[in-house]
Amino acid sequence: MPYRAELKRPDLKGSFPCSICQKVFCHSSSLSRHRMQAHFKSYTCTTCNNEIPSNDTLRSHMYRVHNITRMFMCRCCNWAFPDKTSLHIHMQSMLKNGTPGEAAVLAKSSDVVDSTSESGSPRQSPPFSPDLLMQKRMLQVAANNNNIGSIFPTLLKSPDSKSMFPLDLSNMGPSQFLSAWLANNPINTAALNLAAQQTPSKDSIQSSNISDYDDLEVQTTEEDIKFEVESSDVSPRSVIVKTEPTFKRELEHDADIDVEGDDGEPPLKMTIDDKNIHISHDQPSPTVSDSHISGGSSSHSGESLKCFDCQVARGKLVAVEDKCRAYEKTIRELQVQVDFLRKIQPNPMPPVMLPPPMMPMPSPGPNNLFQNPAMRMLLNNLIHMNRPSVVP
């Protein structure tokens, strides 16, 4: 095919024949798309028993009516299943018995097949085996290898090749020669036998092959059905309305917020924990801007004021603690001195009482009245007059 060399994933190149019209495709996804568009025109929803015209309508129907965003399509009969387990049960039953099996089905397809087709219903899909699939993959690898002529250039022309291979190599191309060499290689045969011994069972091989080839996961999003919503009549039931958050609308209406400040106060500069902090009332708050108003700006400003008050209280508390430490130190020093004095004088002496001061006697001299004899006589008479009488 001309477009095989332009594929983005050359490792996925291969031949995927359609079991209905025998067309061959390079990718399994191309085969699946072909089967959905050419052979399966309508579906029947098993939940609500509605007829669905196409695959795109099936996806939108499951998304809108039943709120199902993921479903797994069988590439053999294009039935839709809710999970991989149901799909594998269906495929195992198709391989063993030729019947769909008892699995949960979301939608069944109605195929439109020509009269010349071999299989007229999805239940009559041709069975396959792991051995045939392995040989098919080996042939695909051989067909994709375009450099075999450069790897074995002499074997094609060697006369001894007839003894090695009983086939006629004269008319073989590089890819056909590689297929024949792989089929007759004893090392490859031993490797296949070892792989067959290590293979646990055919059921596991079939399930792995089914998971690699026959399951198609379909995810539906709003973007997938956007085109269909615009082109068709939309019922009120299927409209998805995206409401704008009320908080955003409130912010848009209240975008102009006036923040009151003290314009007349000078900037405040203080030191907290050995860090200089300069607070200016002219600077805008980082939590308030003209273009965007944060919902928690008021709470942030309240927290900042609370932190400022806490720092001031903390500074006062530190000063009080320092003063208390100084008082405690002085008390300890005085207590040490008292203990030392008690050790020196175990019995304290009573305090010394000084005598009361006496009347000062006048100094002898010519100006002293008591030195006069007349004055002395008057004093003696006064003393005798004031003396009490003695009773016999």
UniProtKB/Swiss-Prot annotation:
Extent of Low complexity compositional bias: 289-303
Biased composition (Polar residues): 112-123
Listed GO MF terms: DNA-binding transcription factor activity; DNA-binding transcription factor activity, RNA polymerase II-specific; sequence-specific DNA binding; zinc ion binding
Covalent S-S links between cysteines: none
Primary residence: nucleus
Source species, domain of life: Eukaryota
GO biological process per UniProt: cell fate determination; cell migration; regulation of DNA-templated transcription; regulation of neuron differentiation; regulation of transcription by RNA polymerase II
Region (Disordered) residue spans: 106-130, 278-303
SMART domains: ZnF_C2H2 (SM00355)
Subcellular location: Nucleus
InterPro entries documented for this protein: Znf_C2H2_sf (IPR036236), Znf_C2H2_type (IPR013087)
Zinc finger (C2H2-type): 16-39, 43-66, 72-95
GO cellular component, one term: nucleus
Keyword terms of this UniProt record: Metal-binding, Nucleus, Repeat, Transcription, Zinc, Zinc-finger
Described function: Probable transcription factor that acts downstream of egl-15, to promote migration of the HSN motor neurons from the tail to the gonad primordium during HSN cell differentiation.
Protein name, as recorded: Zinc finger protein ham-2
Provenance organism: Caenorhabditis elegans
Gene name tied to this protein: ham-2
